[in-house]
Amino acid sequence: MSLQKLMEPEAGTNRTAVAEFILLGLVQTEEMQPVVFVLLLFAYLVTTGGNLSILAAVLVEPKLHAPMYFFLGNLSVLDVGCITVTVPAMLGRLLSHKSTISYDACLSQLFFFHLLAGMDCFLLTAMAYDRLLAICQPLTYSTRMSQTVQRMLVAASWACAFTNALTHTVAMSTLNFCGPNEVNHFYCDLPQLFQLSCSSTQLNELLLFVAAAFMAVAPLVFISVSYAHVVAAVLQIRSAEGRKKAFSTCGSHLTVVGIFYGTGVFSYMRLGSVESSDKDKGVGVFMTVINPMLNPLIYSLRNTDVQGALCQLLVGKRSLT
């Protein structure tokens, strides 16, 4: 089947363009909307405050000027970006009692969401590679994970994530939407928009499948293999304190990986379902709100260096100047 055929609308469909979508949101009862507003506002403030605090600690604390914390600082930026793409717009709709989003704004939200989510995939992989070198090859670690290598890994991650997000957005822009225009979600995402298209989504679903293999399966396999080597190396450490410290740094990362990939698999591996459900909204909340809010807690609670840097930052022993 040709590329042109895949992008053609189905015969007999009305080709009238949809100018805006209606996002049904998390709840549709007016009584619950103030509660949802307060909870989302609280989550947004906690997430931005927590992640920006970790970023500030990484920048000002010399102990944290190491590759692992360089990647952690980047992860904090991503977490702030991820929740900012969805939550402020939803808060605005709750305040204005308007649930519409323009077609262009919907595509923009789709692009930035997949840009940041894709970057998350590659950054978590880079963090696993960092732990692999630090624990399994400590003698060459400083050379193989130099500042140049760190920056190259982050730059390559941004380039791959940008390419993926742009591909999905351009492919989505080729679809025809002729009604209905109600999105059973609180932000614009691929599976929900596929269900509203009156043209074929075969190409889009194929692209999503290929992207999942490249950006989810391959990184997850690499992370799993890396940590298998890490566990084998840690078990050979004779010092109980050394084993505990190694497992604590790796445990935080594995927890974040498990939550991130678990929610991602549930969201994008269910394209055969006929319609969106409240489960999709729950997973969406986990991906865009809970994950970014939990990440700083997961890393700070299990890492004494981060805890110490945050305490120094909060009591004012160090300043950003």
Swiss-Prot record:
Keyword check for Disulfide bond: yes
Localization terms from the record: Cell membrane
Family: Belongs to the G-protein coupled receptor 1 family.
UniProt protein name: Olfactory receptor 3A3
PANTHER family: OLFACTORY RECEPTOR (PTHR48001)
GO MF: G protein-coupled receptor activity; olfactory receptor activity
Swiss-Prot/TrEMBL keywords: Cell membrane, Disulfide bond, G-protein coupled receptor, Glycoprotein, Membrane, Olfaction, Receptor, Sensory transduction, Transducer, Transmembrane, Transmembrane helix
Glycosylated residues (UniProt): 14
PROSITE patterns: G_PROTEIN_RECEP_F1_2
Transmembrane feature ranges: 35-58, 67-88, 110-129, 150-167, 206-228, 246-268, 282-301
Described purpose of this protein according to its UniProt entry: Odorant receptor.
Pfam families in UniProt: 7tm_4
Disulphide bonds in the chain: 106-198
Topology Extracellular: residue spans: 1-34, 89-109, 168-205, 269-281
Cellular component aspect of the GO annotation: plasma membrane
Organism annotation: Homo sapiens (Human)
Cytoplasmic topological segments: 59-66, 130-149, 229-245, 302-321
Gene responsible for this protein: OR3A3
